[in-house]
Amino acid sequence: MSQEPTTYSLFLFLFLSHGVSSYTVPNSRQDLHPLLQNMAEEIIDGSYLNALLDLIQFQSSHVWTDDLSHRVLAYLNSRNVAFTIPSLQAAVENHLEQRLHQPQKLLEDLRKTDAQQFRTAMKCLLEDKKDGLDLKDIIIDLGEIRERALQSPGVNRSLFLITLERCFQMLNSLECVEILGKVLRGSSGSFLQPDITERLPRDLREDAFKNLSAVFKDLYDKTSAHSQRALYSWMTGILQTSSNATDDSASWVSAEHLWVLGRYMVHLSFEEITKISPIEIGLFISYDNATKQLDMVYDITPELAQAFLERISSSNFNMRNTSTIHRQAHELWALEPFPKMLGLLVCFYNDLELLDATVAQVLLYQMIKCSHLRGFQAGVQKLKAELLDIAMENQTLNETLGSLSDAVVGLTYSQLESLSPEAVHGAISTLNQVSGWAKSQVIILSAKYLAHEKVLSFYNVSQMGALLAGVSTQAFCSMKRKDISQVLRSAVSQYVSDLSPAQQQGILSKMVQAEDTAPGIVEIQGAFFKEVSLFDLRRQPGFNSTVLKDKELGRSQALFLYELLLKTTRRPEELLSAGQLVKGVTCSHIDAMSTDFFLAHFQDFQNNFALLSPYQVNCLAWKYWEVSRLSMPPFLLAALPARYLASVPASQCVPFLISLGKSWLDSLVLDSHKKTSVLRKVQQCLDDSIADEYTVDIMGNLLCHLPAAIIDRGISPRAWATALHGLRDCPDLNPEQKAAVRLKLLGQYGLPQHWTAETTKDLGPFLVLFSGDELSSIATKFPEILLQAASKMARTLPTKEFLWAVFQSVRNSSDKIPSYDPMPGCHGVVAPSSDDIFKLAEANACWALEDLRCMEEDTFIRTVELLGAVQGFSRPQLMTLKEKAIQVWDMPSYWREHHIVSLGRIALALNESELEQLDLSSIDTVASLSWQTEWTPGQAESILQGYLDDSGYSIQDLKSFHLVGLGATLCAINITEIPLIKISEFRVVVARIGTLLCSTHVLAEFKRKAEVVFGDPTEWTSSVLQELGTIAAGLTKAELRMLDKDLMPYFQPSAIKCLPDEIFKELSAEQIASLGPENAAAVTHAQRRRLSPLQLQSLQQALDGAKTHSWQDAPASAGPTRTSSSRSPAGALQSWGLWLGCPLLVLMAKLLW
């Protein structure tokens, strides 16, 4: 892919710079230890890795004295090879850096090492301590070398392969297994391809085999299904060899074998499980760690689980033997030990006949872990429902509530509403730990719990756990501030992120009271801190970098705080090391940094790269280019204008690809044309092909941007398996890439109808690429695998064909029994069942209107929140579901808060008249509606007016949390009423209002209100502009023209999009050029059409990352001094052979003179 740069010129340069060593020692060969003589010969041959290994070996048994360095140099001098200590050090550094970028050559080097050198290399990998070699003149940090090697793309692969090839012949097998574990645990799992098992040793000592099996168990989830099967075969091949089984009727599977297999026991066949001796299975169950093993069989199938349960029941353990179960104590949970031993097998327990209520409760308690299963959740829910019925026999729900575990999430609204406040209060220690609550259930249970409490205090709120989101905004506002403060410092604070924006603002309004702001703000921790308004921050004098370390900052907060603290601190580096504060570093701050300071603290930016905006990255790139382009991390070149990519010589393609592959190109380069240029450079480096798996390792995230042509024809068979493993994780392949992947898969595996279960599992993320006809066979053969694949696509909306295949699969496997008492017009219609709806998730969008209309009322009640979360429902489907809600709950005027909250998107089907009927007196109800973003202006106005009418508030009465809760419906406000909003409430929620995409007229009125808070637009700072968000789109033409061009990058992209076309075109060319890459990418096509040629040129400059600040663009010289040249930088980095892209040098060396 690229040629290794020669080091002759480097050596010559260092030689001339430092001077040739003049040390001479008589009889140097006889006077030098044989290991050091060998090291010197390796240096002469250019085998620096071998030389380093000789040095490490020597140091392990000898003390390095002051004269040894000079003796080594004298020896080299006697061989007519002249080095100084600095030049030798640089040569070794350069060589090792090259090997990090050329891991195939590292593999070759390690193959050529002698036995002693190889053992030394392996021992270095084994060490955990941060050891080093102190050679008096030089300190070599071996710990850093090891860490960098294990983290470098491709190096891990070479270390893995060489360990398999040579280690087991030269070192103790336990040590080799430990090395394999280190290397594999730092990998993506792609090393473990099915054919790798052919290289695994089959004659391991028992302890080494068990340890290596443990490594494979730890990596199970990173391993493909085919590789899991291959590793299982390797493990069982060794286990069967050691088995005492004499014929086919006897099982080779012993208790210890099951323990060794661990998660791999799910690959045992049904027949093998049924042959396991009852004695062995009973012995296995009695092991102390058997439960841990069975708790992790996440991908076990019901059939295999039933087989294991049958063998366990045939052993001396008996689920019904309550005297055995009772053996530890007499309390309810003392019945737990045996069910606990079953691990995830309990999720498939089916011997329910004559089961008593106590054991049913124990089983329910153990079934909490069933959420970890891969699939089969509908069956789990069904089993929980059956156990729930048994657990409540001869008892009321009030009596059993605390002993039903997480099965309580299956209770209907009517069951929850029937609970007494006392029962909920008594069961709170169970209810507060349950996950999976629907929001409507939380509302009901919280109301019951709080009804038992006379005063809302820290103590009773701290008991609520997962039910905290059910506390109303008004209730939070009624609490004392000291109680709120304690809540935010307690364990229950982890649930604050589950609260609605209105609830969070209600809490914030208590913490930040006008008369005493400072203590409240400082006490707010974590992500909640970013909700603090810029206005309140400006009133707080007591911030420092230490106080801010545990707080998440919004960008407007960071901009303000960094500028504030920079004026008062004597150690600006503390601000950069504070993490979140880097969001507030502006281009002017970067420009003002001295060269030494910038280079010394660039690592702080790199450590927090995900927090930086594209504009900040652009500024960092320009700064680095100006002060130290020879050591510039190559990925930063992508932030500069596209022509700068020509600065990457062919010899530096590998570090360029590694550096760029560790970042996400979509967030680094926003302009499609520029991205094309970057990818053209990538293709040039690759020579339009991927030759082997090492190239895949080096590419990292760039794999997701491979052109379709390379995917189709440029990936070699050797590299394809590794590439496919990486492509699985690509979030958004384009249509051409998807088509190319599909063709490759068809070429390799054939049509889906011929696929095995393992193939289907491995290709799960790619099933969406196939047609409905192609998927039909998968839906028939492997319906559960198809469902699992669909569940993992929750972040994206799959194709209609894929969803239809999922739908058909579920419908074909469900009971097709029409209702005994159907609704009128529903005779012969198989209505949706709760199980079907639970399984289908987004594929529920495939229901016909007739199916939804014929849904039974109980089914609707149990699944309404699932249906309300489906993004793909059409307007007619939503209308049908709304009618179903009216049929079940009566007219909207009778609906309570939990009804409205549960509707989700179904509420969008309510017309204006129906919305006016709703009880909208609670801001929490309104907040649940405003969460939807598809309201028509008329609907939004009905919700807003409904809240004002039902609550009795007027516009001037609205508090900050009311404004936040109104959300998008606030855009429906009459502009004549905006001036009535109290400034004291508006100023603390500016950032929230600035997220709304309101009309230009509404934004303009909000902008006028913002002027009261922040002054005239000519006085606005970067932090104010960032805080305002879309409100800034309300600026007039004159105000926009008056803005300093240096403020342009601090508009939010959403504000740029909201600027009317006729106003946007009033920006000067200089202002447009200063927008920055992110804001330039937000410019709409309609806005672009109104621009002049000069403005369009400026826009392209902004998109490309051209310099608009401080220095002039496009310096041509590669030297570190500034230049005013504006020529093309092509070839500017041809002397970039010394680039060391890692934050720390591979060989950490420190000269001590």
Curated annotation (Swiss-Prot):
Organism: Homo sapiens
Gene Ontology annotations for the cellular component aspect, listed alphabetically: apical plasma membrane; cell surface; extracellular region; plasma membrane; side of membrane
GO-annotated biological processes: cell-matrix adhesion; multicellular organism growth; sensory perception of sound; transmission of nerve impulse
Prodomain residues: 1131-1153
Full protein name: Otoancorin
Subcellular location as annotated: Apical cell membrane; Secreted, Extracellular space, Extracellular matrix
Membrane topology type: Lipid-anchor; GPI-anchor
Alphabetically ordered keywords of this record: Cell membrane, Deafness, Extracellular matrix, Glycoprotein, GPI-anchor, Hearing, Lipoprotein, Membrane, Non-syndromic deafness, Secreted, Signal
UniProt signal peptide: 1-22
Keyword check for Secreted: yes
Family to which this protein belongs: Belongs to the stereocilin family.
Associated disease: Deafness, autosomal recessive, 22: A form of non-syndromic sensorineural hearing loss. Sensorineural deafness results from damage to the neural receptors of the inner ear, the nerve pathways to the brain, or the area of the brain that receives sound information.
Summary of the function given for this chain in its UniProt record: May act as an adhesion molecule.
Region feature (Disordered): 1109-1128
InterPro entries in alphabetical order: Stereocilin-rel
Lipidation residue positions, type GPI-anchor amidated alanine: A1130
Glycosylation sites: N156, N211, N244, N289, N321, N394, N398, N460, N544, N812, N911, N974
Main location (coarse class): membrane
